[in-house]
Amino acid sequence: MVIGADTFWPDVNGAARFTERLAAGLVQRGHDVHVVAPNQAYRSVKPRIEVIEGEAMTLHRLPSVRWAPHDWLRFIWPWRSKHYARKVLDEVRPDVVHIQSHIIIGRGLSRIAHQRGIPVIATNHVMAENILDHTTMPKFIDDIMLHLAWADAKRTFDLTRAVTTPTRRAADFLERTVDVEGVIPISCGIDRTQYTPVVAPREKNRIVFVGRLTAEKQVDVILRAMTKLDPALDVSFDIVGGGDQRKMLEGLTHQLGLQDRVTFHGRISDAELRGLLSRASLFVIASVAELQSIATMEAMASALPIVAADAVALPHLVHDGQNGYLFEPGNVAELAARLTDVLTADPAEYERMQRASLDGVAVHDINRTLDTFEALYRGEALPD
């Protein structure tokens, strides 16, 4: 099979992480997996074996250029996507193509695969609004581009056997926005055995955020909420991830006088991340553009209460008053109050929230995700 992705290792974001785990899981199940993704330079390379998530698979890395306003986003020239698609499909002759984005690589693969009668499955991880954060163009041009992007997405999705997205809320959003029917919600899934939940009160109050430091993540809202917390709580804030907003956020941290309480870790190893999650008191996310949030699921698998913005798909994971709290997006005072609710909870209440996170993430097991996609690839009925 061929998996097409506009972002893949070494990129660090939810879509790339899911695609890596999907590909590795399919290899473990005996499938011959070929991944088509941007190269890290504008250079042609032959297909090669790479080890991803501990599994060997064939990577077809395509010449790409970096989008100048962004620190890591790379793309292939759109007018070359069909050429590369023909080349890969000629060589691999797959039984099925699974695209992870309708933007460039997936767009080309879907059209050529459709012409050749190869079934196409499309998974949407993208909100076009996120991409527009990096255009640096006037809003009226962004609005035109947004309309054109979703119209083109519909043309791509109309060529597929099935369209999936990580949650029911995200599926509803896609059906409304793109005018497609029957979008199937399939969780990105995680391997819960890879995380170490510590169900117990914490000695220190540590909150953590994991994700790209981009505008839609609204990490600045969390920093401002930190200034409204009771100093007696002695709260520290760990920020994991890189992005184009990092310098601005570091400057804001100093401006707010938080430099002794906030640590920017950048990109860290999986082992370091799991250790950080196991030591944290809670996970916080202020993002307004999450179609699921693998980082939130990882925190839940680590038995952390979650404080999240009440936006898009986050309420699918965070049930207010159960495994944490929701707050109005952008509302600094409400976020500070919800953080305080978790940090001042008595031991029994804190443990109840921890166990609710563990219970809530159980339905997102990666094996269920793989079972469902295999059924789609084969054109079979989906598992219950």
Question: What spans do the regions from the language model cover?
Answer:
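Short alpha-helical donor nucleotide-sugar binding micro-motif in glycosyltransferases
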Residues: 89, 157, 267-268, 275-280
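Conserved donor-binding/catalytic core segment of Leloir-type glycosyltransferases
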Residues: 199-226, 238
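Short hydrophobic beta-strand element within catalytic cores of glycosyltransferases
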Residues: 305-308
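N-terminal subdomain of nucleotide-sugar transferases
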Residues: 1-61, 368
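Nucleotide-activated donor-binding/catalytic signature segment of Leloir-type glycosyltransferases, i.e.
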Residues: 250-268
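Conserved acidic donor-binding segment of nucleotide-sugar-dependent glycosyltransferases
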Residues: 320-321, 325-332, 341-347
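Carbohydrate-associated surface elements
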Residues: 39, 169, 189
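Aromatic "clamp/platform" in nucleotide-sugar-dependent glycosyltransferases that forms part
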Residues: 288
